[in-house]
Amino acid sequence: MAEDYDFCLDNPLFYVSSKSIPDISKKFSVPLPDNWDEYKQNQEWVALFPLNSKIQRQGWKVHISSKIDQSEDILNIVSEVCFSMSITFKHLSSLEFFVKRNSKQIDRGVSGKFITCYPNENDLEHFLNILEEKLKKFDGPYILSDKKWKESPIYLRYGVFRDSNKEDGYSCDSQTLKINDKFILDQRLPQFVVPEGLQIPDFLISWISEEDEIDDKDSYVMPFLIEKPIIFSNSGGIYRGVFNNTKVIVREARPYTGIENNGLDAVSRTKSEKLALDKLSNIEGVPNCYWYGKLWDNYYLVTEEREGVALNHWLTQNYPLYDEKYDEKTSNNYLSRITSIVEQIIKIVKSAHATKIYHQDIHMKNIIIDTQDNVSLIDWEQSVYNEKDKRRHLVAAPGFRNWGYTTPENIDWYGVYQVANTLLYPAIVQSDLVYGYGKQTSIAGSKILEKFNYSKIEIENYIKLLDTLSKKIGNIKVLSPSKVLHPYLEEENYDTLENKKNRILKGLFEGFDSIYRRWEKEKRFFPVHYYGLNKNNGVAYSDLGVLWAYSQLLEQLDIPKNSEYEELEKHLVSKAIINIEGNSINDNGLLDGISGTIWLLDRLKYTREAARLYSKHFKKLISSSKNMRLYDGLCGILLVGIDFSSKGLLSKKVCEDVFNEIEKFTLKYINHPETFIPITKDNKKSNDPYKINGGLLYGHAGLGWLFGEMYHLTSIDIYKKALNVSIKNELKVYQVDKHGTLQYSQGDRILPYLSMGSGGLGILIYENYKIIDNEYKLILNKLYKAVDGNFCMFPGLFNGLSGLKVCQFFMNKYLSEVNNDLILEDYIDELNGYLIKIGNGVCIAGDGGMKITEDIASGFGGIVIALCCFIQNDFILLPKVKI
């Protein structure tokens, strides 16, 4: 099941639940008449209803939309009508939620709704007529899931009003309609749908069949042809089309939608872009504007389609990730190409500034590059025309937001600077977290290019270009809490491996203490990635997992546990046991649930308690497992069982039960593997652990880990057979790329990671090298090539550098490509590009690069476990049998 992640980015350092951030925006409220009541359904909605009254189970919902500056007036009018007619209604609770409901990225099926009314069908026509008369002078965004009533911002759709109850005579939830004794899904789509078989009131029949009114029929004749959509958002679509036999881009703007932090809506931004393009029409590298106007309710901007691809796509195709050493005759000469690209961008920006136009949203996706490396700068909708008006950079892509109050000119140059940094070292999102991070990426990027024998002069010239751009930005006084974070600029080129290793271990130790004292310990004791904010069990994201990693760090540094640590450990262990015994946990998996927590108790030397809990709850864990996967399913639960069995921690009876379950699991898998995990490529790109079906943690390779460990324990051939079947099935969703690497295929990308890709499969083959079929031994080299890249976006264990290097280390034991000490040294050197200096220590920004995390999957915990794998010469992330 896919998870809905409740998080926000308002905390400057950490991911936090949106519920933990107070809403300080203006609240919507109306006086409450006698015999009425009010309650908050949730943070977003306030419901008002007459006492001792009932509403229909389902019916015609009446939705009201509003312009932001008319919202209070509309609420007062609608509430008075509802009060007078005793009609239940609800409204958004605050201005913050109003803006979110009308923002660019909101689901189009729910956007625009400010007030929802629930009239009984007998009152519907009269209610609509009264509202229409009172709201004629108001405007609001079109609600795409509904149909507009007449001229006012009133919209209707048929849907569920409430859950069913005993009086209804049937049982169904708020997602289900009952039509003619059939139960159907109440779909919230971005289009008006009338449920099949619905009996429609007479006065609505003609309304449903008629087209929405258009003031001027001629205004709906499109002067351009739309060929296909590129993307949809709440603000409108972006399309490819044709205008006067010329290929064009058509940008649609829906009024009063796409409200951003600067208060501008989609139409305002489109008008701004039109003005900018007209003034820049003679500048090379800026697309021409061909047409602008209103059609029906929406506005359209038609611009020249520039040939080429977005610069971020160009980067993925050309960055020297696996290329051979630089050779003038054979290389694409990456460094000279990116120098030319940056110089072209500088020229365009200088020309625009000379006309007093400032782009304000320069980033990789807004730059188009053709096959000849010619550059175009597109998407001028954020443009401003006052160079001296200092402001905060409110609308920006991740990694491209300038710091503090600054001028529009400086905002543009910061964008160019960050583009240049990205082309040198693509992981620049951390720039939003750490002021001056570009100094760190320039060092890391230079080291990558040095591997390809680019001359020192070439590299220095590019660094000088970066320095020139940096001077255009100026210095900012950082006053936010993130001022405690600094770029990690330590030079360690000539130090010994032992000193490098000790330095990073000590840095992680000091940094952990600094973070612990800054983190507000309300529900969680450590900051984690948003994937794990609501998952405080299992190995991946739990507090106990972080504590295990920290305990491993103390052991490596030979630092005794102090009283504060011991008190915290006792508290977390006690809390974990109480939660398990209290049956208050729904997740049972190894990485996200109870079985993982029990395994961690053993890792923390609470072995007797871990064995007792597993024995007591084993059958319930098995019966309530959600799926078959290692990450969150039956496979991980059984794996903990054979780990404990091999150590003699379980009674004979429990061991027999575990072994019987594994035997049934294995036989069923051999005969019907497709029923365990789909053997098809994932079409959608995602790092979400609940949306992936490949790799060691989520795919057939994870099942293979269980089969391999069971064979090591029992030497029964059926488990060896199942292991080979699992590798065969895993490989069905892998592909070889142009560099000869073998990687997991997902959507239009391929992945080498420990959790989902080449690295994890390589670890499985390494651990079972002596018992797998020869054909699978032969692919180890291609998997090794996949993890032996020059760059990775993030530093973490599951989906980042740490996991890749651990996998490379163990695969190399059979391949002997390099000395394994060199792999550890490379890992530490490359990790320097991601480290953040805090106090006397260092910390890590997890996957995404936006916030500090300490979990095992993405942050501090994963770095520590990776280092321990190297130092202990053992893959310690997953349970393994003791023989």
Residue spans for each PLM region:
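Juxta-kinase regulatory segment immediately upstream of eukaryotic protein kinase catalytic domains
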Residues: 2-19, 171-228
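ATP-binding glycine-rich phosphate-binding loop
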Residues: 27-46, 206-244
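ATP-binding glycine-rich loop module of kinase domains
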Residues: 58-68, 227-229, 234-273
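Helical subdomain adjoining the active site within ATP-dependent kinase catalytic cores
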Residues: 127-196, 418, 422-522
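Terminal, non-catalytic domain-edge segments
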Residues: 138, 476-524, 687, 709, ...
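Short beta-strand micro-motifs within the conserved protein kinase catalytic domain, predominantly
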Residues: 288-299
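Catalytic-loop of the protein kinase fold
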Residues: 349-369
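C-lobe/activation-segment region of protein kinase-like
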Residues: 382-447
